[in-house]
């Protein structure tokens, strides 16, 4: 599985939102900016700013690839639950499709707050809520159930997105704005569909028989060809101030 391709695809879903929120948060005036869970650098590689950019991730392989895509960024191998930075270091700290994967998302937000300067901003650009996923036609509901179970097997919290704003509040972050991302469920191009199915096949391998995966993949393709496919996963964002 080419994860940089996947992360780059996810980055397209939030590009307009990121432009809006980074402007609101004063990206052009910031001196230091941190991405927690930077992965392969899909977001960092797109940032245009004079600020000193920093990225942290728990996966050494992802960081190695991030160095290729974002060579000017200061990268650190570390855990979001215990950030290896002094208090009040950054003007902006953000994450992207991260908190659902974190064992203790509230602690991660507390740490993000700790390393953010007074008056600085914390942004969570995208956190999905798979517990309210919609799949149509009904024959594809099973796919959603499988994917949700797969996330749980991998240690994720599929319903975290709906609790994002609550978690900001509990972490003591003053919320400026929160809501759901619009347009994530738009009809994918053939290439995007193949990327999506590469992720599905990777996730389901080992606990769903291969023939069942291929059967539901054909059903998905046929439903899209008939114009009947509906897939909606509510995906939340929040940004606030320290």
Predicted feature descriptions by range:
Residues 34, 40-82:
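Class I SAM-dependent methyltransferase SAM/SAH-binding core
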Residues 12-31:
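Conserved alpha-helix/loop element of class I SAM-dependent methyltransferases that forms part
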Residues 106-118:
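A short glycine-rich, Lys/Arg-flanked "PGG" loop and its adjoining helix->strand segment in the class I
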């Amino acid at each position: 599985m080419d994860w940089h391709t996947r992360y780059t695809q996810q980055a397209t879903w939030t590009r307009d939102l990121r432009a809006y929120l980074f402007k609101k948060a004063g990206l052009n005036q910031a001196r230091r900016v941190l991405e927690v869970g930077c992965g392969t650098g899909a977001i960092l590689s797109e940032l245009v700013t004079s600020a000193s950019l920093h990225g942290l991730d728990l996966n050494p392989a992802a960081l190695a690839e991030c160095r290729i895509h974002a060579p000017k960024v200061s990268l650190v191998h570390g855990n979001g639950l215990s950030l290896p930075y002094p208090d009040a270091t950054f003007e902006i700290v953000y994450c992207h499709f991260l908190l659902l994967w974190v064992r203790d998302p509230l602690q991660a937000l507390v740490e993000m707050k700790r390393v953010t300067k007074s008056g600085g901003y914390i942004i969570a650009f995208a956190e999905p809520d798979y517990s309210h996923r919609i799949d149509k036609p009904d024959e594809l509901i099973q796919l959603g159930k499988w994917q949700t179970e797969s996330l749980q097997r991998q240690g994720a919290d599929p319903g975290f997105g709906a609790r994002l704003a609550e978690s900001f509040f509990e972490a003591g972050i003053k919320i400026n704005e929160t809501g759901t991302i619009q347009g994530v469920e738009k009809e994918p191009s053939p290439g995007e569909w193949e990327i999506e199915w590469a992720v599905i096949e990777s996730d389901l391998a080992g606990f769903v028989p291969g023939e069942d995966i291929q059967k539901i993949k054909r059903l998905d393709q046929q439903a899209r060809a008939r114009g009947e496919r509906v897939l909606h996963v509510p995906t939340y964002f929040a940004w606030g101030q320290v």
